[in-house]
From Swiss-Prot:
Gene3D superfamilies: Severin
Native organism taxonomy: Eukaryota, Fungi, Dikarya, Ascomycota, Pezizomycotina
Record function comment: Controls reversibly actin polymerization and depolymerization in a pH-sensitive manner. It has the ability to bind G- and F-actin in a 1:1 ratio of cofilin to actin. Binding to F-actin is regulated by tropomyosin. It is the major component of intranuclear and cytoplasmic actin rods. Required for accumulation of actin at the cell division site via depolymerizing actin at the cell ends. In association with myosin II has a role in the assembly of the contractile ring via severing actin filaments. Involved in the maintenance of the contractile ring once formed.
Full protein name: Cofilin
Originating gene: COF1
Compartment list: Cytoplasm; Cytoplasm, Cytoskeleton; Nucleus matrix
PANTHER family membership: COFILIN-RELATED (PTHR11913)
Length: 153
């Protein structure tokens, strides 16, 4: 259980293991349920299109406890695959991204921040973690550079 009291749905863990072990998904986006009591899957996709993933985050919404809908935070895992510049082959790194746009509501941002560790603890095998607060933070090239530690071709 997280500091916010939210629990992680078993579906979240099952889907993550399908991404990690079976390569069933390229990415998974997680969200808090509307009542903020459980972390659930927002979208699990086989799409290798970075823009599809990026748009899922950018277009995410959240409802405040008063019912107002605005931009929303999300958690995501993305299975990065890249070639090493040295020619030594292909590498995969599962990356956890905490998306909390600057213009999201204060309340959703606080609840997401206090629930993040519970999800991360449930997902064994994350290689890299990133915090993203605006669209520049989720540009493919900049994330790939971080994930690969500058070793990608």
């Amino acid at each position: 259980m997280s500091q916010s009291g939210a629990t992680v749905s078993q579906d979240c863990i099952t889907a993550f293991n399908d991404l990690k072990l079976n390569k069933k998904y390229k990415f998974i986006v997680y969200k808090l349920s509307d009542d903020y009591k459980e972390i659930v899957i927002d979208k699990a996709s086989e799409s290798r299109d970075w823009e599809d993933f990026r748009e899922t985050l950018v277009n995410a919404t959240a409802k405040s406890r008063t019912g107002a809908v605005g931009k929303g935070p999300r958690y995501a895992v993305y299975d990065f695959e890249y070639n090493l510049a040295s020619g030594d082959g292909i590498r995969n790194k599962i990356t956890f991204i905490a998306w909390s746009p600057d213009d999201a509501g204060i309340q959703p941002k606080m609840i997401y921040a206090s629930s993040k560790e519970a999800l991360k603890r449930s997902l064994t095998g994350i290689a890299t973690e990133l915090q993203a607060n605006d669209t520049d933070d989720i540009e493919y090239d900049s994330i790939l550079k971080t994930v690969s530690k500058g070793l990608a071709a």
